[in-house]
Amino acid sequence: MLNNKILSCGLTGNFGFFHTKISILYGTNIVSGLNYKKKGSLYLNLPIFSSSYKSVKITKCKISIIFIPSYFCKNIIIENIYSGIKIIVCISEDITLYDMLKIKFFCNKYNILFIGPNSPGIIIPFYKIRLGIFPIKNIIIGNLFIFSRSGTLTYKAIKLSRKNKLGQSLCLGIGGDIIIGLNIKKFFSYFINFNLTKNILIIGEIGSTIENQFLKYKKKKIFFFISGIFSPLKTTMGHSGAINNKFNDILKKIKKIKKYFLILNNLNEINLIK
């Protein structure tokens, strides 16, 4: 992943243009954009292609970043997959459940690493890789891997990690929609032996069981922060995936995690990570 070229799907839109420009200035190797209506034009001195296939064939890109409206995402993502893209980072939010189930099916079938939807993306400071919308003001090279479902809390953790001179080795927003595409085992096959990472901070919340996949992991030191302890039952809090219910009660989750790892009472305790 660290040396692959990147296709920006949605580069020609205002949102995609803005964040693609920031990523390029940061040092990310984005080489092309995608828009069949504007094929042959240049944006940020990058060629715009009519299809993922042409972009992959000509530029040899293996990663795509998705900035397009949610109702177009399914077709573009499946086109990415068939064209040979291996890693897809989806910033778009509110992809329908039906579309996400189809996307997950194709990602599993073709062994694709999919991050999102409704994700701030991924940033790797040492390699100057920014795939998404992360603010770079507080990004500094360090040894803390921040893994989060909440974009806003990720940004706060980044700011506090800089303040406490921890820095970041890698920051990942897994996505806030009800169905996310991330395969944890596949993601860690790429990054678990990432030498720059000393500690992992997992920012969990209500409405998710993804934290449970880390309970018996021992290769790196892991710390948790779980938000939403006072949230009411059966109420969406913040985004569509954050729902506290009797099948995934947050207090039961915290009790289970405490058996294995330290849980921070709030993110200001990030200075406990050493």
Regions found by a protein language model. Name each.
Residues 1-274:
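Catalytic-core regions of core metabolic enzymes
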